[in-house]
Amino acid sequence: MNCLRPLAPGGKYLFLATCRGYLNYRAELTVDSLAQKEHQYVLQFPLPSISIPVLVRGVYYEFDKADLTDNSREALDRLVKVLKENPNITIELSAHCDYRGRAEYNERLSQRRAESVVKYLTEHGIEAERLTAKGYGESQPKTVSKKMTEKYPFLHENDVLTEEFILKLKPEQQDVCNSLNRRTEFRVLRTTYGLVDSQGNLVARPQ
């Protein structure tokens, strides 16, 4: 079946990409009012998997504090957008520290940082019951992905950035690994928020 449709010059279009096991993604397209009869537009739809934690890039905190820096707003607004585009998910929002400092202190600090992010999200329209804040301190060091090895050639896929691993590296490489361990992530807990009642009966269709 031919699903092609002409796009009106100057028109604005909203596209939604969905796939089971992945987060939804929306993209907007404004057609050039002076576009020729045939013009190609390319839209990319990065769909993060819900089976693994998703890194929230660009979230920063004041040194040794839980306060979010001003330049974190853009990243947090993107996360708000993701949650609004996926209204049926609940998430665990986690914060992680590097190994420096006492483990108990790092766990408390990371918990307060996770709570700071959750506070921002609720203040921007996300339901509190969809969000769980969790601080892991230094207990979950980052595992190196294949993509990370392209940016950091001294690392290998599936390396785990533990204290023991990091201390064997050069000082500048240690700094990189510690920064990778200091991160904010989220993972999907449920995909049925607002869809079922307390008895498990379907009350709404997925959005």
Regions flagged by a language model, labelled:
Residues M1-T90, E129, K151, Q174-S179, ...:
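Periplasmic peptidoglycan-binding/tethering modules of Gram-negative envelope proteins
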Residues H96-Q207:
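Periplasmic OmpA-like peptidoglycan-binding domain that tethers envelope proteins to the cell wall
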